[in-house]
């Protein structure tokens, strides 16, 4: 394995090749490799060291040192105490030149990568400035425009809620007043109904009295008819008696004319007639007076009962009219109450719908505020990620700067003069071969993070021989 291939593979493994995109991940792996050093005695120059330090967004760090590797297939050379075989020095110089050429190529590649990273850092800084400007603009807009808009809308909603509360209180007061009026009218209706029942009871009693008076009048009328019939019968009987008496008187008059003288009989008959006529007139006058008195009493009672009946009918008519007017008034109040209750239900439903709409509006505004907060938090997280990337790139730039400074200082060192070396005779075949296999210990540390918090951390050790 050549130095260039080792360095390239290590560089691709640490920083990613041209076709590999560096993607941020929630897991970070730290890989540490042990240092490999190859040396051969004190005749060689100090081992050439090359260190690569890089920091990628994924968080991978690696160090690696390599030295000039001597092949075991170099032919054995016998070195004398006072002479040097320059073929070995030529081979070393050739290999050193090749190594320097490879190092120059690698440095050129590193410079290109470094330029790309600088461009990337500048681009990320510009993006960072743009995001900061957008964040400041969003903060200013959120404080100026959205805050004022929300405050104005909240004031309007509060004003509408206060107005609706006042309207509701006014409607409730009107409802209470109407309820009191209805209760008062109901009490008045109950009183009128009681008075109506009393009037009906009085009317019923009056009707019973009228019926009794009518029965009494009919009885009296029947009695009057019977008395009139009796009077007619008595008149007829009296006339018959008078006729009989006149017949008897005439018969007696005839007999008296025969027996006695005429003037004495006439006077007697006149006296008898006068007596009977006086008795009949007296009886007739008494009967007429009794009939007239009874008829007057019955007429007066009938008139009195008729007046009471007429008054009762008038009172009943008045009570019926009052009951009808009160019934109409109660029906009107019931209609008014139903309309007010319907209006109140409609207003309550409207209030409920408007309150639900206001709650939905408030919820929507709160959701928008929450979304804006989440978006601001996301921008802040992106800004923090960009800051982390920038810090990693700053560290990488500093590492490249140290690399360049180290390479410049190493390149400025003088080459050793192999012609002036005083080597003693040594058989290279007797020397132990350089162990071309080295032991490398890999420490793989995996850290899993979520939302900036460490949720899992594992470490693994691997031994690798090359």
UniProtKB/Swiss-Prot annotation:
There is a cross-link at residues 104, 120, 129, 139, 223, 262, 294, 313, 373, 439, 445 (Glycyl lysine isopeptide (Lys-Gly) (interchain with G-Cter in SUMO2)). Residues 269-407 are annotated as: Coil 2. The modification Phosphoserine is found at residues 5, 7-10, 25-26, 34, 39, 42, 47, 49, 51, 55-56, 66, 72-73, 83, 87, 144, 214, 226, 299, 325, 409, 412, 419-420, 430, 438, 459. SUPFAM superfamilies: Intermediate filament protein, coiled coil region. GO terms for cellular component: axon; cell leading edge; cytoplasm; cytoskeleton; cytosol; extracellular exosome; focal adhesion; intermediate filament. Residues 408-466 are annotated as: Tail. It is found in: Cytoplasm; Cytoplasm, Cytoskeleton; Nucleus matrix; Cell membrane. Induction: Up-regulated by muramyl-dipeptide and lipopolysaccharide. Residues 103-411 form the IF rod domain. The modification Phosphotyrosine is found at residues 53, 61, 117. Residues 132-153 are annotated as: Linker 1. A motif ([IL]-x-C-x-x-[DE] motif) lies at residues 326-329. Residues 1-13, 20-32 have a biased composition (Low complexity). The record marks 351 as: Stutter. Changing residue 208 to R: In CTRCT30; uncertain significance. The modification N-acetylserine is found at residue 2. Residues 154-245 are annotated as: Coil 1B. Keywords: Acetylation, Cataract, Cell membrane, Coiled coil, Cytoplasm, Cytoskeleton, Disease variant, Glycoprotein, Host-virus interaction, Intermediate filament, Isopeptide bond, Membrane, Nucleus, Phosphoprotein, S-nitrosylation, Ubl conjugation. The keyword Transit peptide does not apply. Its main location: cytoplasm. Filament disassembly during mitosis is promoted by phosphorylation at Ser-55 as well as by nestin. One of the most prominent phosphoproteins in various cells of mesenchymal origin. Phosphorylation is enhanced during cell division, at which time vimentin filaments are significantly reorganized. Phosphorylation by PKN1 inhibits the formation of filaments. Phosphorylated at Ser-56 by CDK5 during neutrophil secretion in the cytoplasm. Phosphorylated by STK33. Phosphorylated on tyrosine residues by SRMS. O-glycosylated during cytokinesis at sites identical or close to phosphorylation sites, this interferes with the phosphorylation status. Homomer assembled from elementary dimers. Identified in complexes that contain VIM, EZR, AHNAK, BFSP1, BFSP2, ANK2, PLEC, PRX and spectrin. Interacts with BCAS3. Interacts with LGSN. Interacts with SYNM. Interacts (via rod region) with PLEC (via CH 1 domain). Interacts with PLEC isoform 1C. Interacts with STK33. Interacts with LARP6. Interacts with RAB8B. Interacts with TOR1A; the interaction associates TOR1A with the cytoskeleton. Interacts with TOR1AIP1. Interacts with DIAPH1. Interacts with EPPK1; interaction is dependent of higher-order structure of intermediate filament. It is linked to Cataract 30, multiple types: An opacification of the crystalline lens of the eye that frequently results in visual impairment or blindness. Opacities vary in morphology, are often confined to a portion of the lens, and may be static or progressive. In general, the more posteriorly located and dense an opacity, the greater the impact on visual function. The central alpha-helical coiled-coil IF rod domain mediates elementary homodimerization. The [IL]-x-C-x-x-[DE] motif is a proposed target motif for cysteine S-nitrosylation mediated by the iNOS-S100A8/A9 transnitrosylase complex. This is Vimentin. It comes from Homo sapiens. The gene is VIM.
């Amino acid at each position: 394995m050549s130095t260039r291939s080792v360095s390239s593979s290590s560089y691709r493994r640490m920083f990613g090749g041209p076709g590999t995109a560096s993607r941020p991940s929630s897991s970070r792996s730290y890989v540490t490799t042990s240092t490999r050093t190859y040396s051969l005695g004190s005749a060689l120059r100090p081992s050439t060291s090359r260190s690569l330090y890089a920091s990628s967004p994924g968080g991978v760090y690696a160090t690696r040192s390599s030295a000039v590797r001597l092949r075991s297939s170099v032919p054995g050379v016998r070195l004398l105490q006072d002479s040097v075989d320059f073929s070995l020095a030529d081979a070393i110089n050739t290999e050193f030149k090749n190594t320097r050429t490879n190092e120059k190529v690698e440095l050129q590649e590193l410079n290109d990568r470094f330029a790309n990273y600088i461009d990337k850092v500048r681009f990320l800084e510009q993006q960072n400035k743009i995001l900061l400007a957008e964040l400041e603009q969003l903060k200013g807009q959120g404080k100026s425009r959205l805050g004022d808009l929300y405050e104005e809308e909240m004031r309007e909603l509060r004003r509408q809620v206060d107005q609706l509360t006042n309207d509701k209180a006014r409607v409730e007061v009107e409802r209470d007043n109407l309820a009191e009026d209805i209760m008062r009218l109901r009490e008045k209706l109950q009183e009128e109904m009681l008075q109506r029942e009393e009037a009906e009871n009085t009317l019923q009693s009056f009707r019973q009295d009228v019926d009794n008076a009518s029965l009494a009048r009919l009885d009296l009328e029947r009695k009057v008819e019977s008395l009139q019939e009796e009077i007619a019968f008595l008149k007829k009987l009296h006339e018959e008696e008078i006729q009989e008496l006149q017949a008897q008187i005439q018969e007696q008059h005839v007999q008296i004319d025969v027996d006695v003288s005429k003037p004495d009989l006439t006077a007697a008959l006149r006296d008898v007639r006068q007596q009977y006529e006086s008795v009949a007139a007296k009886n007739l006058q008494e009967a007429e007076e009794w009939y007239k008195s009874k008829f007057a009493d019955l007429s007066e009672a009938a008139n009195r009962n008729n007046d009471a009946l007429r008054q009762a009918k008038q009172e009943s008519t008045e009570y019926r009219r009052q009951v009808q007017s009160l019934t109409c008034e109660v029906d009107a109040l019931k209609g008014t109450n139903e309309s007010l209750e319907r209006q109140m239900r409609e207003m309550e439903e409207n209030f409920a719908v408007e309150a639900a709409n206001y709650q939905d509006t408030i919820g929507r505004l709160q959701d928008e505020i929450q979304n804006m907060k989440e978006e601001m938090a996301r921008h802040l997280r992106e800004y923090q990620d960009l800051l982390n990337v920038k810090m990693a790139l700053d560290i990488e730039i500093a590492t490249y700067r140290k690399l360049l400074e180290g390479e410049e200082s190493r390149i400025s060192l003088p080459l050793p003069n192999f012609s002036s070396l005083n080597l003693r005779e040594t058989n290279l075949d007797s020397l132990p071969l350089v162990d071309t296999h080295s032991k490398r210990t890999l420490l793989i540390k995996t850290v899993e993070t979520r939302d900036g918090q460490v949720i899992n951390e594992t470490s693994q050790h691997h031994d690798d021989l090359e």
